[in-house]
């Protein structure tokens, strides 16, 4: 069944279906109201079959959108997590957050690991752990629950526009959309406690606001970051200071290694590791993060 509408649809190149609310009429293209041709018009079997086919097509066209709308719907909406892009009205939708651990030799040593080129390890944070910080803003960052030893870790973050599996390192940067400055905030006492018990330490890394992030800068404008000064200061005193060239695994190598274990996709972001001298923050501290080639990022612990 279909509902008649006020419309005219060509049929088989010779007839026209004229839909009216109270009737369905066939006419030929050159027929005029009241003309002899119109009075003599008598639909043939071919005309009637074409009419039925057209009516079915109209019916299906009207029913399809309704059927789609009638499909399963979420019981409640879940907000989409996005990151602003500098110079763009569009935003970057986040799919997953990957983080690499101990990717600077000096930081590996201070965390009790071998600084040699051992295989990298990764962990994840929930996408809704992101706290966006605008350029020029000093954003309030809440001191989290359960910890008495809250640490800063400043990092370069890569944002992917595409992905795949087993990506060669020499092709990996082709998948990078852009870069941002980030903070991997850590409840160090909880992380260390779980590590001592040989248990997963998500509670120390994966919590609300744990992924602080500046806006994304397209790589088409900044180029790729393989070297450059990176630092963090607390209340004007520099605490972390290093260079991206001191990474054990480059961003390209991280992407290649990750793609061996996971299918990477557009929307994935990668925290590329922090240099040495991570340390605690307390309420009232103002953190200033710097990365050569990107605007500064700042938060206040509240």
Task: List each language-model region with its residue ranges.
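Secretory targeting signals
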Residues: 1-4, 11-43
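N-terminal secretory signal peptides and thylakoid transit peptides that target proteins
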Residues: 38-55
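C-terminal segment of classical bacterial N-terminal signal peptides
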Residues: 58-65
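Extended, compositionally biased flexible segments
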Residues: 70-171
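Catalytic-pocket segment enriched in acidic/His residues
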Residues: 70-91, 107, 135-137, 188-302
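A generic structural signal for short beta-strands and their flanking turns/coil linkers
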Residues: 117-119, 126, 152-156, 175-181, ...
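Short, structured patches in soluble enzyme cores that scaffold and shape functional sites
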Residues: 125, 156, 160-162, 180-185, ...
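Hydrophobic, well-structured mid-protein blocks that either form specific transmembrane helices
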Residues: 166-200
């Amino acid at each position: 069944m279909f509902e008649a509408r006020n419309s005219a649809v060509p049929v088989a190149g010779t007839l026209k279906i004229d839909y009216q609310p109270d009737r369905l009429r066939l006419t030929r293209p050159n027929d005029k109201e009241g003309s002899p041709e119109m009075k003599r018009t008598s639909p043939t079997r071919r005309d009637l079959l074409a009419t039925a086919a057209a009516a079915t097509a109209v019916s299906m066209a009207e029913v399809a959108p309704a059927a789609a709308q009638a499909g399963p719907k979420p019981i409640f909406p879940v907000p989409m997590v996005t990151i602003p892009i500098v110079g763009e009205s569009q935003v970057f939708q986040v799919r997953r957050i990957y983080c690499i651990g101990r990717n600077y030799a000096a930081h590996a040593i201070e965390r009790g690991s071998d600084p040699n080129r051992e295989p990298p390890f990764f962990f994840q944070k929930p996408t809704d752990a992101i706290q966006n910080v605008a350029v020029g803003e000093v954003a309030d960052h809440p001191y989290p629950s359960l910890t008495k030893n809250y640490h800063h870790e400043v990092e370069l973050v890569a944002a992917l526009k595409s992905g795949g599996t087993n990506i060669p390192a020499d092709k990996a940067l082709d998948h990078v959309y852009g870069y941002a400055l980030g903070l991997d905030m850590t409840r160090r006492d909880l992380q260390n406690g779980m590590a001592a018990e040989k248990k997963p330490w998500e509670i120390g890394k994966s919590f609300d606001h744990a992924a602080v992030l500046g806006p994304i800068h397209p790589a088409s404008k900044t180029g790729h970051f393989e070297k450059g000064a990176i630092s963090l200061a607390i209340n004007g005193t520099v605490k972390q200071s290093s260079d991206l060239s001191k990474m054990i695994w480059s961003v390209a190598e991280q992407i290649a290694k990750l793609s061996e274990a996971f299918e990477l996709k557009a929307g994935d972001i990668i925290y590329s590791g922090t240099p040495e001298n991570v340390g605690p923050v307390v309420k009232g501290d103002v953190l200033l993060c710097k990365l050569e080639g990107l605007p500064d990022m700042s938060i206040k612990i509240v």
